[in-house]
Amino acid sequence: MEKRSNKYYLTLSLKEYANGETQPAKELGIEFDNHDEIFGIIERIKEKKLFADDSEAVQFAIGLKLFSEIKIKNRKNPLFDELNEVFPVFMKKLKSL
């Protein structure tokens, strides 16, 4: 039986370069699946007040969920060898806060 997952579409837009320029504008959109409901995770991370502001909490939650889903799908990839031991410890710590 195939596991069901949530389907997402994420848009990333470059609004301003470090030098203050706004052109050329850049934007990309990606479709992806994730086994978690990411909006709920964002709210839980924000409620924990782990970061200076809600924007950082949102960035952390989105980055973590994108990264962790790829890591799960590619767990046998040698790139993740060192993380396979410590990442579950990190996730347990995060969930316990």
Question: Can you say where each PLM-predicted feature lies in the sequence?
Answer:
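N-terminal intrinsically disordered, cationic/polar leader segments
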Residues: E2-D54, N74, P78-L97
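Short, well-ordered alpha-helical segments
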Residues: E56-G63
